């Protein structure tokens, strides 16, 4: 017998786990709109208070993938997603979006799953729009962009229409729920490799093990000790690495890669225009902490994608494609191509 919403709520109140298969059925009911808003809010609150387990998160992510509009990609070799849970409150420029262009220029295929702003002043979707790209592409258009430019951006509302069912509840609740950590786990292109930033240190090991359960090939899940959901320059970064079916947790520091430490306040922006300006400075090879943090995160993406042998090797490759202009050229090519896609009948 599938678990009922009432039984699920009771479990959370008693701090007992909703098992993986039960969570799958419960999430299907929620995504089909069969559970009342009041009950959805109660269950989400109960899960948050008791703390979601690996099995619960993996079960919920499985259903979100089921209900998504998929991007068909024939060759996933060297494919990577660079994504964060958001919610770290850092208000930095869009580091992961800038790293996307660098990683693509360095030889990775970047299938980035993103949305509008959560923790930064400019989310990945906001940043791409400010750069002139078209973000609301259909799945087949994303596949075409990925094939032609090495970059495919999947705007979450296009690919997860079923999320409209829970959007009003999430908006009214106004607090983090399991859905905040599901987005990065539900890449519509099925990227087998992922660089994921998280907003809490506990999630480093949890999300790495969820990805392991979901069948990912390689992953780096990161949290900076200064609170950033990126590999940080301002402090050490906790890392959960999935490789060869095993999860290993460790800590890295910017000095390990020949990068000077720098406080995150040096990366802060007030709005999308400032974020755009800082991103372009990086791609135009202007030295400073913004370039350093992009090289570090793009280097990690190249490592997890299997292009680089190590993060350090990835950082060198990232700096090279920024310096020779190919990362900036990749941005320009992507903007032009998405505009062409948007006007095609």
Swiss-Prot record:
It catalyses: N-(5-phospho-beta-D-ribosyl)anthranilate + diphosphate = 5-phospho-alpha-D-ribose 1-diphosphate + anthranilate. Mg(2+) 2 binds at residues 229-230. 5-phospho-alpha-D-ribose 1-diphosphate binds at residues 84, 87-88, 92, 94-97, 112-120, 124. It comes from the Bacteria. The keyword Magnesium applies. Its EC number is 2.4.2.18. InterPro entries: Anthranilate_Pribosyl_Tfrase, Glycosyl_Trfase_fam3, Glycosyl_Trfase_fam3_N_dom, Glycosyl_Trfase_fam3_N_dom_sf, Nuc_phospho_transferase. GO terms for cellular component: cytosol. Homodimer. Catalyzes the transfer of the phosphoribosyl group of 5-phosphorylribose-1-pyrophosphate (PRPP) to anthranilate to yield N-(5'-phosphoribosyl)-anthranilate (PRA). This is Anthranilate phosphoribosyltransferase. The gene is trpD.
């Amino acid at each position: 017998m599938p678990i009922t919403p009432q039984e699920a709520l009771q479990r959370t109140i008693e701090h007992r786990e909703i098992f993986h298969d039960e969570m799958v059925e419960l999430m299907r009911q929620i995504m089909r709109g069969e559970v009342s808003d009041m009950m959805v809010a109660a269950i989400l609150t109960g899960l948050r208070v008791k703390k979601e387990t690996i099995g619960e998160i993996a079960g919920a992510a499985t259903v979100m993938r089921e209900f998504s509009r998929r991007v068909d990609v024939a060759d996933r070799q060297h494919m990577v997603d660079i994504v964060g849970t958001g919610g770290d409150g850092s208000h930095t420029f869009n580091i992961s979006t800038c790293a996307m262009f660098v990683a693509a220029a360095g030889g990775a295929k970047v299938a980035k799953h993103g949305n509008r702003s959560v923790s930064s002043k400019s989310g990945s979707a906001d940043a791409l729009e400010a750069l002139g790209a078209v973000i609301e592409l259909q799945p087949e258009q994303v596949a075409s962009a990925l094939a032609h430019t090495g970059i495919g951006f999947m705007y979450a509302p296009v690919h997860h229409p079923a999320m409209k069912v829970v959007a009003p509840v999430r908006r009214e609740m106004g607090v983090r729920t399991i859905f905040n950590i599901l987005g990065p786990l539900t890449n519509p292109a099925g990227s087998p490799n992922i660089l994921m930033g998280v907003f809490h240190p506990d999630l480093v090991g949890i999300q790495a093990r969820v990805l392991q359960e979901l069948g990912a090939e390689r992953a780096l899940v990161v949290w900076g000790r200064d609170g950033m959901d990126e590999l940080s320059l301002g402090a050490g970064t906790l890392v959960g690495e999935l490789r060869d079916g095993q999860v290993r947790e460790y800590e890295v520091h910017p000095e390990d890669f020949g990068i000077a430490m720098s406080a995150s306040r040096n990366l802060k922006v007030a709005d999308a225009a400032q974020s755009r300006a800082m991103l372009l400075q990086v791609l135009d090879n202007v030295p400073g902490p913004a370039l350093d943090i992009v090289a570090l995160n793009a280097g990690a993406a190249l490592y997890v994608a299997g292009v680089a042998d190590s993060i350090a090797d990835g950082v060198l490759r990232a700096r090279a494609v920024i310096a020779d202009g190919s990362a900036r050229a990749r941005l320009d090519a992507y903007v032009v191509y998405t505009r062409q896609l948007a006007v095609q009948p």
